[in-house]
Curated annotation (Swiss-Prot):
GO terms for molecular function: electron transfer activity; FMN binding; NADH:ubiquinone reductase (non-electrogenic) activity; NADPH dehydrogenase (quinone) activity. Its EC number is 1.6.5.2. InterPro entries: Flavodoxin_fold, Flavoprotein-like_sf, K_H_efflux_KefF, KefG/KefF. This is Glutathione-regulated potassium-efflux system ancillary protein KefF. Regulatory subunit of a potassium efflux system that confers protection against electrophiles. Required for full activity of KefC. Shows redox enzymatic activity, but this enzymatic activity is not required for activation of KefC. Homodimer. Interacts with KefC. NCBIfam families: PRK00871.1. FMN binds at residues 8, 14-17, 65-68, 105-108. Its main location: membrane. It catalyses: a quinone + NADH + H(+) = a quinol + NAD(+); a quinone + NADPH + H(+) = a quinol + NADP(+). It holds the Pfam family Flavodoxin_2.
Amino acid sequence: MILIIYAHPYPHHSHANKRMLEQARTLEGVEIRSLYQLYPDFNIDIAAEQEALSRADLIVWQHPMQWYSIPPLLKLWIDKVLSHGWAYGHGGKALHGKHLLWAVTTGGGESHFEIGAHPGFDVLSQPLQATAIYCGLNWLPPFAMHCTFICDDETLEGQARHYKQRLLEWQEAHHG
């Protein structure tokens, strides 16, 4: 099962993420948990989130890039849900062997995220990649949809179909 942890503080303003979710919903075996809908007060139901993660084979963290990072509710979700003794540490093996895909949308072009001489997403993904590895997750190459503020509908739709294709290819490779 593919579990999409969707974290957009203003989902009604997002044309790109909306299209990505619409494409993902057309696949079998996809569950979407919209954190800002579920937890507008930031009071996360840790047991419910861990139960959802337990059912997943592929976990997707989907969100808009905010100041070169993740939205605050996703950060809190990571801090609370990926707990010691469950996701890492002594006895914390609940996520071992599962896969993680970072799916991010940006308003700027890819070159906007270069940091000095370093390709931006290689640097920006390091904290998330380190978290994944620490929890025994298999890190997949990120999916990034750039220039979402200026893309026309056709371009956004094409990129959303590419996202669906990435998910479908993962499903086919892991479940035939």
